[in-house]
Amino acid sequence: MSFAARATPIHAIPREPGITTRDLSLWYGDFQALKNITVEIQRGLITSLIGPSGCGKTTLLRCFNRVNERYGYVRTTGEIKILKKNIYDADVSLIELRKSVGMVFQRPNPLPVSVYENVIFGKRLHSEPKDLTKSELDAAVELALTEVGLWNDLKDRLDARATELQLEQQQKLCIARLLPVKPEIILMDEPCSALDVEGTRAIEELMWTLRGRYTLVIVTHNMAQARRASDECVFMLLGELVEHRRTEDLFLNPRDPRTAEYIEGRYG
């Protein structure tokens, strides 16, 4: 039985929006990368963003924690609500937003310090030193590493340099680094692209383990991965949202011919 088959059935997770966009458009200079995207991503599920290169899926993912804004030539219109709050409201703190919406990148990017210091990096960053005790930090490290399945392997190596770990362990550690600040949403931009088959399988299994406690949104070019490792899929093309459905429905009975053409490998 697959790990997905052992996970909580989708109908057992209450339907509640985790991320909602309305008429979201984004320009890089004069180039429009997103065109009036309206989508509702369900809380507690795994949603894959799929489509050919340049379709806008990574741009959309990075809108959800406003990472795109680090580029000075970006303009955005429309609305994004995270847990029913518009993230473009004037009173929204980017620091608080990025605590709630963590991100994992294509290549593992552990800090060049110990495993222990990697895990508590965010907690130290967002807390006053006087508010943190050694026992609290120790507990946070154990809990986070347990959640990602690394505690048994690394509990005796917490002082080891994180960059010396295997790539799969590094990527799991990057996920663990998000957890002590209690995110609601975890964004993943092709998190398995640097991993081998076994590493990919391990990250996909971890995603199913985290599902329900967190909302996961993943960008992937791998159609088999999207089908194996997500509850719902959003298919994008040329900056537009073409189709958003439960994963099996989208793959078995796509409503839009463009979706069918992409799934069948006719372009992309």
Where are these regions (language model features)?
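Conserved ABC ATPase signature
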Residues: 160-165, 169
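Catalytic Walker B motif of ABC-type/P-loop ATPase nucleotide-binding domains
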Residues: 186-189
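ABC ATPase NBD coupling module
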Residues: 73-75, 86-102, 212, 250-254
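ABC-type ATPase nucleotide-binding domains, specifically the catalytic core motifs of the NBD
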Residues: 68-72, 90-92, 117-137, 149
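The feature captures the beta-strand-to-loop junction immediately N-terminal to the Walker
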Residues: 50-52
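ABC ATPase "signature
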Residues: 244-245
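Conserved ABC ATPase "signature" region
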Residues: 79-86, 132-156
